[in-house]
């Protein structure tokens, strides 16, 4: 039997005395589509924030492709560095795309990976020196640029790489947001 790509078990989250998530379990296979619906205040956004490691559940676990990424009972899995690394497994596209108007489409796609790269470069500089860090930064920045261009091609916007969000239609902006999530 094929293992689930995403497995969520027993996710609970409370804010004060209000329990918002009450033991959520779900399993998804690759290619599955999930719609989360509910009334205002029912915990939809809180669940997504927990799945994206933007919120820490009080209880429960999250596994991706068989790898346990978070176990609320294991303090090691809740370390800041591990949570930041695990965030890279997920991308969300919300109704409002929040593209940065001062950046081109390509720059919008490259922003988050470039910011994550800064932490890596700092660690390499400390461990291996300035030259090694610079070399790594240049190589990784080129890889980020190429991946961003490939994603733009994938969503049919390669020709819009140097455009600004205000120059795109709403649908094109949404495709940029999808590429950014990927």
Name these PLM-found stretches:
Residues 3-182:
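ABC family nucleotide-binding domain
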